[in-house]
Amino acid sequence: MIPESYIESWRTHVSWQTLAMVEQDMVISRALINLYNHPKIQDSLIFRGGTALNKLIIVPPSRYSEDIDFVQRRSEPIGETIDAIRNVLDPWLGDPKRKLTERSAKLVYQYAAINNLPSKLKVEINTTEHFQVLPPFKVLYSMDSDWFKGSCTIMTHELEELLATKLRALYQRRKGRDLFDLWFVFSRKLADIDNVIKIFHKYCKNDGIAITKDIFHSNMVQKRLNKDFQVDMNVLL
C-alpha cells in the first residue's frame, strides 16, 4: 500500500524485523491522526494498551504493536462513534469487517502490504468499562513522512493508569507482551510502582474482584509454564 522507499525511510523511527511491520506502524500512525482529528473520537474515546504505551510514552518504541485499542469515556451508544471511525478510515483502508459483542466493538481493515502480503489493522473499543481513576491525559502526536504528514491531540490515560490496566491484562490473559511492557517501564524507573498497584486495586474493586499478592503470584507461576505466554514476544522485538 505504501511505496517501499517511504517504508525504508520510516525505519529511522522503528527498527522492526520486516518492512511489513514498519509499514503497519505507519498505517497505525496515520490512523491515529485521522481518528483524533475527528471531534467525536476526540470527545468519546481513550487510547490505551500496548500500542498507546509505545506510540505516546516510550520513545523510541520498545516493541512492535499491531492493533489500536480504545475504551469509551462514558456510557453511550457506540453507533455514532463507529460512523466517525469509518468516516476517516474507510476512504483509504476500505470497508472493514465488523463485530459487535456485549463488551466490545471491533473493526478489522484488511489491506495489501508491501510485496502484496495480506495485512490488517484492528480497531477495538471496550464499550462496557466507563471507568477512570485519573483524569484523561492529552498528548500531542505527529507523523512526518513522504507518505503522510499530520498531527493531532490524543486522549489517553496517565502513564501509571496505563500500567495499572496492563497489570490487570497480565493477570487476565496469557500474553508475554504485558509482562515485557511492565518490565520495560519499571526497569527504567519511568513510573511509581506503588501508585500503579493502588490504581490496579481500584480497577479490581470496580470489576468486583479481589486479587491478593499470593493469588497474583500463583497466576504468574502458571503462566510461566504456558507455551503461548513464553513465545508471545518472539516476533514483537
Question: Each predicted region: which residue ranges?
Answer:
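Glycine-rich beta-strand-to-loop/alpha-helix junction loops that act as flexible
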Residues: F47-A52
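Structured mid-to-C-terminal alpha-helical surface segments
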Residues: M1-L45, L56-R63, I68, Q72-L237
